[in-house]
């Protein structure tokens, strides 16, 4: 461990009891107050829409995709609060997995119930480490008049689904939200996630069907627009992979970009291997568990895997399939873990709006260019940090998202974006879908020049060791004198942290409560 993390022996401590790191939440505020700017990120706030922005009205014009934490969750909360007071809204239904301890989202649901609307909340009590918090919220929801469902006995409900039903002069209409992350105001400022909001009638009807099935503990077997695990999630994605494989075998420059947290599902791994052998270029962005090896000759030589670990926790799931002519892209709450594909109720959706397809494609391409937070897997399963070549500009995909989404509230068309598209992005055109029969037509040979070799990487700059400063502060030791040649740094003004982590029980308290049960 010392070797892999490049630590000296004096940085390692041995103890028999479980390690409780909850003190770090308090430590961060103390360290900032005492002046240690080098240990902190520059404050960054989620971008807000114009003051007159109305998400519910915007969704009636076109689909909307919010990207957290770069864009604020406040427009979604405002839409819920408005629905709670709208006399034409007859019901609000939502799946709740992890909620903030002071949740405006749950407050909006309770307000809607108090206003006489039908409110259905599916609360998953088995959300790890949030069991007590979810129990407390479920009691308050019931007291406010909400119908609370506690999910399945054999399947954990991990989906992020909201359905607002409105009855107007022209009949019923829906606003459906499908996300990759929780309805949690705190984590929406720490995790990267995507929230798709639409007024599509067919998606609304399918979402209504999902809630009806959840109410009677039945799984959703049929859906057209939505992916619903465990019966209609993996099968749809495998079909998409088969479609791309067929395109590659006919000579098209087919490719896939798959972004999620983890992968362990055997069926998907075997299909990825088949796609690689068929000539499909596969780029995977996998932050956590990865049970497939990249670039193994004869098996996964066309499969490239990278992990992004930076300021924010990469939590979004995007699945993009390019058959050489057209792009089909999905977002979902589920990863490629067997527990997600077979043992949980997950929800995903195909994004069809051309502007949003291009937006998601730009996000994926930006992350594939990252040379600051990225580590790539080699054939042995080891990860190597990406080192920029000499003269190559640094690309931090997380910070680049602020620029990418700078004009997003104005909804610029893809061809009006300020960021120029790369050759790869130009190839991934957004067009109507193509059938397998069309793929079987004779195709012209597609010439693709070999990629240029990067120049020799420049030696990495030596990073300052902040451990010494941390130890000195904790032990109230004076800091070592700086060399005379260096001017002392100006004191940093005291500012509050960007996000304050919610108070949780310590690990020892959780273990003790477990044994008391």
Predicted feature descriptions by range:
Residues 281-285:
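Hydrophobic alpha/beta core scaffold segments
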Residues 266:
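Active-site glycine- and acidic-residue-rich loops that bind
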Residues 1-256, 274, 278, 290-312, ...:
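N-terminal localization/anchoring segments of enzymes in phospholipid and broader phosphate metabolism
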């Amino acid at each position: 461990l010392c070797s892999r993390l490049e630590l000296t022996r004096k940085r390692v401590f041995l103890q028999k009891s479980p390690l409780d790191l909850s003190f770090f939440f308090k430590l961060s505020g103390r360290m900032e107050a005492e002046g240690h700017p080098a240990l902190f990120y520059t404050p960054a706030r989620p971008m807000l829409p114009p003051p007159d922005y109305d998400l519910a009205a915007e969704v009636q014009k076109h689909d909307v995709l919010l990207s957290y934490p770069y864009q604020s969750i406040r427009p979604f909360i405002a839409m819920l609060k408005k629905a709670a007071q709208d006399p034409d809204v007859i019901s609000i239904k939502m799946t709740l997995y992890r909620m903030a301890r002071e949740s405006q989202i749950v407050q909006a649901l309770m307000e809607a119930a108090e206003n006489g609307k039908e409110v259905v909340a599916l609360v998953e009590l088995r959300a790890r480490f949030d069991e007590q918090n979810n129990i407390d919220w479920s009691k308050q929801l019931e007291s406010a008049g909400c119908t609370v469902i506690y999910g399945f006995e054999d399947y954990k409900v991990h989906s992020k689904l909201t359905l607002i039903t409105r009855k107007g002069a022209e009949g019923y209409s829906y606003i459906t939200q499908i996300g990759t992350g929780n309805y949690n105001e705190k984590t929406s400022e720490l995790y990267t996630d995507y929230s798709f909001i639409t007024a599509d009638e067919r998606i609304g009807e399918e979402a209504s069907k999902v809630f009806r099935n959840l109410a009677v503990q039945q799984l959703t077997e049929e859906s057209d627009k939505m992916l619903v695990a465990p019966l209609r999630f993996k099968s749809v994605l495998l079909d998409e992979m088969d479609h791309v494989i067929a395109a590659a075998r006919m000579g098209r420059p087919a490719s896939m970009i798959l972004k999620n947290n983890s992968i362990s599902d055997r069926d998907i791994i075997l299909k990825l291997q088949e796609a690689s052998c068929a000539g499909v270029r596969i780029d995977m962005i996998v932050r956590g568990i990865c049970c497939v090896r990249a670039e193994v000759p004869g098996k996964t030589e066309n499969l490239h895997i990278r992990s992004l670990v930076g300021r924010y926790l990469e939590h979004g799931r995007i699945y993009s399939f390019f058959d050489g002519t057209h792009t089909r892209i999905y977002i979902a709450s589920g990863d490629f873990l067997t527990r997600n594909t077979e043992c949980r109720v997950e929800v995903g959706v195909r994004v069809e709006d051309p502007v949003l397809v291009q937006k998601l494609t730009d996000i994926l391409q930006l992350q594939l260019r990252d040379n600051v937070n990225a580590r790539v897997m080699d054939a042995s399963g080891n990860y190597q940090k990406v080192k920029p070549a000499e003269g190559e500009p640094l690309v931090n995909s997380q910070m680049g998202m602020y620029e990418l989404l700078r004009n997003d509230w104005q909804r610029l068309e893809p061809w009006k974006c300020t960021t120029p598209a790369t050759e790869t992005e130009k190839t991934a055109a957004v067009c109507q879908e193509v059938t397998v029969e069309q793929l079987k037509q004779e195709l012209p040979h597609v010439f693709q020049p070999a990629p240029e070799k990067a120049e020799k990487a420049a030696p990495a700059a030596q990073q300052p060791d902040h451990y010494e400063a941390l130890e000195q502060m904790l032990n109230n030791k004076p800091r070592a004198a700086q060399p005379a040649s260096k001017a002392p740094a100006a004191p940093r003004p005291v500012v509050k942290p960007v996000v304050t982590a919610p108070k949780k029980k310590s690990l020892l308290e959780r273990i003790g409560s477990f044994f008391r049960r």
